[in-house]
Amino acid sequence: MLVHQVNTKLCSAKQFTHLAKVVTPALSYQASSVYSANLPRLAASPRLFSTTSSAQLRDFFPVKETEHIRQTPPTWPHHGLTEKEMVDVVPGHRKPRTLGDKFAWSLVRISRWGMDKVSGLSSEQQQINKGSPTTSIVAAKPLTEAQWLSRFIFLESIAAVPGMVAGMLRHLHSLRRLKRDNGWIETLLEEAYNERMHLLTFLKMCEPGWLMKILIIGAQGVYFNAMFVAYLISPKICHRFVGYLEEEAVHTYTRSIEELERGDLPKWSDPKFQVPEIAVSYWGMPEGHRTMRDLLLYIRADEANHRGVHHTLGNLNQVEDPNPFVSDYKGDKPRPVAASRPEGFEREEVIGKEVIGKEVIEKDVIGKEVLGKQVSV
């Protein structure tokens, strides 16, 4: 009978030495690769509203590679801004004049208070100044970079809702009336697109956790439906509400810029810090002007523009008046600059008085067109 002798040793000393020489470099290479890949993300500070581990961060919306398409440019390219236009933006406030204005302003203040509470800001970090009708841009204690990003992402996720709702309803209104909308739809949809680009930019810097995602879904559902019903009831109050909301956005970004300039946000002040490529492409940020401060200046200028647009639209006839920000004026008069007027333009400034001279085309009995006299409408 054959008896097989079993070697109980795993390997001899010579074999073990040879095996170690082969395995050790491979293991060390994998370990170093994993460590180096995760090192920058591990360095990121904890994020409010985020349950995602820093080590699990990834490109939140990677570009899909296709065989033929190289890239998809923005549908609405940014119109561009000069440094002077961005620096000249100042916080402002339109004092409530009507009952609707007061209602809209109260809703914004309540929303701001609720956002501060949900964000977990301490009393020293909150901006609300009870002794002033506007929000203070200075607080006793600065926010961290993580707190700012969490706040930006949540706010921008719902900031794009009003423009889309208003644009959609005005589009349907135009179809029902079989009439032109006179430029309102394009401006409102472009605003929604612009706010979404703000969100996508910040998402390249911070991935929200599951709690933030749930809050965004809930807030969007409530906000969209509430805005939908409210705009059907009173478009004027809705535009005033969004105007006040954009005032708060200008205050928020102004405070973040000032904290950055004071050195309270060292990670964003680092000369090595670069803004996401999506921001460089969308705003056309030139070389040497791609810091976090530059990015915040661009976004604040956008919010200032929305502030002026909505306060102005809230002053107009919601059915008949054209959009003054896309219209061509008589006598080569320049278009109004929304960002330059925090409280918006009055109707008389951009449309004119209630009685306007208008040339009427009439036809005589033989069908020839005759230029009629000016009449009042």
From Swiss-Prot:
- Give me the residues that bind Fe cation 1, please: 156, 195, 198, 303
| The name this protein goes by in its record | Alternative oxidase, mitochondrial
Membrane topology term: Multi-pass membrane protein
What does the protein in this record do?
Catalyzes cyanide-resistant oxygen consumption. May increase respiration when the cytochrome respiratory pathway is restricted, or in response to low temperatures.
- Give the EC number: 1.-.-.-
Cofactor(s) in the UniProt record: Fe cation
**What InterPro entries is this protein classified in?**
AOX, AOX_sf
Enzyme class (EC, first level):
oxidoreductase
User: What is the UniProt remark on how the cofactor binds and its stoichiometry?
Assistant: Binds 2 iron ions per subunit.
Q: Could you tell me where this protein is found in the cell?
A: Mitochondrion inner membrane
Q: Name the major location.
A: mitochondrion
